[in-house]
Amino acid sequence: MDKEQARKEIKRLTALVAYHNKLYYEEAQPEISDYEFDQLLEKLIALENQFPDLRLPNSPTQRVGGEPSKKFATVYHQYPMLSLSNTYSAEEVMQFVKRAHKQLPGATIEFFCELKFDGVAISLLYKEGKLDKVVTRGDGFKGDDITENAKQIPNIPQIIEHKDLPPAFEVRGEAFMSLADFEKLNRDRLAHGLEPLANPRNATAGTLKTLKSTGPKRWLDCYMYSLLSTDMDLPTHEVCIQWLEKWCFHVSPTYKKCRTLEEVMAYIEYWESAKNSLPVAIDGVVIKVNDTLQQNKLGLTAKSPRWAIAYKYKPENLATILESVDYQVGRTGVITPVAHLKPILLAGTIVKRATLHNAGEIQRLDLHLGDTVFIEKGGEIIPKITGTDVSKRSLDSEPVKFVTHCPACGTELVKRYEKALYYCPNTKGCPYQLQGLLKHFVHRKAMDIRSIGKQTIEMLINRGLVHTPADLYSLKYQDIRSLEGFKDLATRNVLSGIESSKQRPFERVLFALGIRHVGEVIADKITQYYTDIDTLSNATVEDLIAIPFIGTEIAHSVTNYFENPENLALIDVLKQAGLQLSRPQLATVFATQSLPLSGKTFVISGTFQNFEREELKELIKKKGGGILTNISAKLNYLIIGENPGPGKVAQAQALGISTINETEILQMLEL
């Protein structure tokens, strides 16, 4: 690979890893397995090591985790809360042990081995024996204050009474949800018409970040694994664990002190075969140098300690038979194929289904009915098919062909965008889409009508009582009372929930409409700039992409939604029902107002020494500025590099718009 190819690949991988980092740490909605993420990160690290001058300033290899959330107060860590370097290779564990001996010549080194629980790292701060704060890892230097939420976890002690307590100390651990409680939670969600959560880690992260301090925190548990204090003599990690146990913190009893590499490898091998017997998900083993002075000598990198490493188990991959494929219809009309498999025991659970994602995946795998397929469960509830054993394929086997018509309403499918995604275009008449839209509309993050679950929605649709979300607001007592199983109290609960939803703020209503690509965060961002539905409905694509973090795809999706007369009619009914379709002016005091480029708009023309144009656009957006594509009276600045478009320069001069160069925009960006 030459240097130009490396530059492009580093840029691509940096953006890709940052994207998946955000999904994992900030949104708790990962799209790929840990193993796939680690492989991407390893590729980026290898390229950056080969071409160190091409490493980007925002490289995820130089930072930990994700940004703290704006929803919670930020707390700076007294000691950096670094992540661990990890490996899937036994050889690299051996190299780690050899490096430790090389850097500590002649020393006797003990290694402390612990299981790596698949949860969320948290820090507990105690003062005078009382729990003062609980903070997430965040970016390693600062995290979110989740104290009130964490206090709901039963085995986090809020007061410790012991004569040997120091004035202040910090305990670190892993919050998690047991496999049994995770299954109970998902059964509960399904009973209320909610989508099941993907895995226990997602459930834990989402629960800890729920703004309400009440709720299902008692589903959570916590294992503690670290003690920090300037007021204590802590010569070894083993002593730290002993103090935690003495103070009645919840410590996993699965740790082991090892004196040789052979003992370390035996510990790894034992738990690889025994991990499915545990009540909680693990994804590997953590190996630490036990002695604190030796840890200090080995030191830290910017991202991780040199005295510890995480060995991660590869996802299990087993073979079974593909029996059939069916097709599910989502609320936006997306058709998702699901493979039905001959049941097999994988990672401690019986697996009968696997996701196939889209038509492209079926084609890539060259699937035939009756194939012997390899499945992998990398922490997700629905595993995926990773390959096919073609040598075992029957000569008369039938290839899997993606459906051409909607399985719910029979409408011919259409392919949209460049992705291998097929949609049912019958947005108003497809019963599965309506079910999905209504489930989304009543969700707690949208209109929060918790008294309406999946079964109620199905009955309302089957009775012809509801054809759009707006029809919920015209339901009468007798309409609901006539549904199977509904008595007076349940009926009144539904009506009360519908009435209460009229007070949900504008950003929640916008999210509830189910506009493609407009999630909870994007809805909030849009309504900070467009504070009522009428103004938003008249916004152009160019107007919308001027909003930080709003790209072309989202902007087109929003404008397309408001160009549809049926959607405008729906909004009129929601207005008449009394929903909040505007945001109070006070709410426009949003986070970007204190950023250096807040409220300013820019057009970029030409090439630049320090940036690609897309990089410059993202920097401007992150500093609060907006990006326009054309010169207009709305523009504040035209940024000109080498060989700018002469037409744009002339147009800017004619309108009296300021032109600035690369040095000036760097000053404005405060870089």
Curated annotation (Swiss-Prot):
Role of this protein = DNA ligase that catalyzes the formation of phosphodiester linkages between 5'-phosphoryl and 3'-hydroxyl groups in double-stranded DNA using NAD as a coenzyme and as the energy source for the reaction. It is essential for DNA replication and repair of damaged DNA.
Asked if Disulfide bond is a keyword of the record, the answer is no
- EC number(s) reported in the record: 6.5.1.2
State the needed cofactors, names only.
Answer: Mg(2+); Mn(2+)
Q: Which UniProt keywords apply?
A: DNA damage, DNA repair, DNA replication, Ligase, Magnesium, Manganese, Metal-binding, NAD, Zinc
Q: Which residues bind Zn(2+)?
A: C406, C409, C424, C430
Q: Do the record's keywords include Zinc?
A: yes
According to the UniProt record, one GO cellular component term is:
cytosol
Query: What PANTHER family does the record tag this protein with?
Result: CHROMOSOME TRANSMISSION FIDELITY FACTOR 18, DNA LIGASE
Q: What is the protein name for this chain? A: DNA ligase
One GO term in the molecular function aspect is: metal ion binding
One GO term under biological process is: DNA repair
Q: What reaction(s) does this enzyme catalyze?
A: NAD(+) + (deoxyribonucleotide)n-3'-hydroxyl + 5'-phospho-(deoxyribonucleotide)m = (deoxyribonucleotide)n+m + AMP + beta-nicotinamide D-nucleotide
Q: Which organism is it from?
A: Amoebophilus asiaticus (strain 5a2)
Q: Which family does it belong to?
A: Belongs to the NAD-dependent DNA ligase family. LigA subfamily.
Q: Where is the BRCT domain?
A: 592-671
InterPro entries this protein is in?
Answer: BRCT_dom, BRCT_dom_sf, DisA/LigA_HHH, DNA_ligase, DNA_ligase_AS, DNA_ligase_CS, DNAligase_adenylation, DNAligase_N
Active site: which residues? Answer: K116 (n6-amp-lysine intermediate)
Lineage, top-rank taxon, reads Bacteria
Looking up Pfam families in the UniProt record yields: BRCT, DNA_ligase_aden, DNA_ligase_OB, DNA_ligase_ZBD, HHH_2, Nlig-Ia
Positions binding NAD(+) in this chain are D34, Y35, E36, F37, D38, S83, L84, E114, R137, E174, K288, K312
